Curated annotation (Swiss-Prot):
The protein's assembly and partners: The cytochrome bc1 complex contains 11 subunits: 3 respiratory subunits (MT-CYB, CYC1 and UQCRFS1), 2 core proteins (UQCRC1 and UQCRC2) and 6 low-molecular weight proteins (UQCRH/QCR6, UQCRB/QCR7, UQCRQ/QCR8, UQCR10/QCR9, UQCR11/QCR10 and a cleavage product of UQCRFS1). This cytochrome bc1 complex then forms a dimer.
Cofactor binding, note field: Binds 2 heme b groups non-covalently.
Residues the entry annotates as binding a ubiquinone: H201
Transmembrane segments annotated in the record for this chain: 33-53, 77-98, 113-133, 178-198, 226-246, 288-308, 320-340, 347-367
Protein's recorded name: Cytochrome b
InterPro entries, sorted: Cyt_b/b6_C, Cyt_b/b6_C_sf, Cyt_b/b6_N, Cytb/b6-like_sf, Cytochrome_b, Cytochrome_b_C_euk/bac, Cytochrome_b_N_euk/bac, Di-haem_cyt_TM
Amino acid sequence: MTNIRKSHPLIKIINHSFIDLPTPSNISAWWNFGSLLGVCLALQIITGLFLAMHYTADTTTAFSSVTHICRDVNYGWLIRYAHANGASMFFIFLYFHIGRGIYYGSYNFMETWNIGVILLFLVMATAFMGYVLPWGQMSFWGATVITNLLSAIPYIGPTLVEWIWGGFSVDKATLTRFFAFHFILPFIITAMVMIHLLFLHETGSNNPSGLNSDSDKIPFXPYYTIKDILGVLLMLLTLLSLILFSPDLLGDPDNYSPANPLNTPPHIKPEWYFLFAYAILRSIPNKLGGVLALAFSILILMLFPTLHMSKQRSMLFRPVSQCLLWILVANLIILTWIGGQPVEYPFITIGQMASISYFCIILILMPTTSLMENKLLKW
């Protein structure tokens, strides 16, 4: 009798994806982030579902319903902070996952990479809409500022903004539709993740050397299942420490004040994981230019396969490119810092310099460095 694991139509799919999957024997801890993102997504959907049971998407009661969850619902505070800080963990892992992809040349799997970029956009949209739901000051003004950016689109802009708002300002209609989208998008993300994995399993995983590893594969279980479980335990330890010791570390105190359309907070800023993009947006004095720079700062990821000039796939044996990548990381950290600062000298200038460097490193320096390395290696 054949093993049910290999014969049952449904279990067979799981088997080929997580158990008998041939995996390179040399993938490092940088390959753990995919599974960690999966766990984060599951955690967000579960905590979100429980929050939705008690939340009301109405401007008059949204803020107090979140307060009610924290004060009166059994372990409501835990669910709420797990959801809020889980989003931060999600983005940390997303950025590590993308960084790994850039360092080891994983973007050469074109379909997998492009679906990954679409996933990033979907997760960013979901996080933005989720931030609006508690209906605090930063929720309201964040929604107003970010949706208003679309008014920079020529001709259809202003109409588009009012269409998204469902009125002439961010109000009840906006909150209701944001809740609807925030609820449905994670399930769309889950479907996209499955497609992401489908395309990944067509080619097999990349590995640190960037070389073909068909000659040296091991089964996913038990080797990488154990490795992934270790990653998950470390993640849960970090997340629980954050939730139980300083749950508001990454939040904004302004969001503990109910939304007031008549009172603008002194510094409007998004959650920390959007600050780098926000800094790029603010560094350009022109509204449309800023919006285009903002969009392109993420869309630029789609150009990586085209900009890959090296004869080697991975950066493992390319020290100059490695240096450039770490400069890019430092640059992104500077942008994140600038995004949280007020718009005044010297922050404006630093932000502009960092924004220019961001695009220059990716579009000019990295490809030219790759060509130089090819020359040095007489390739």
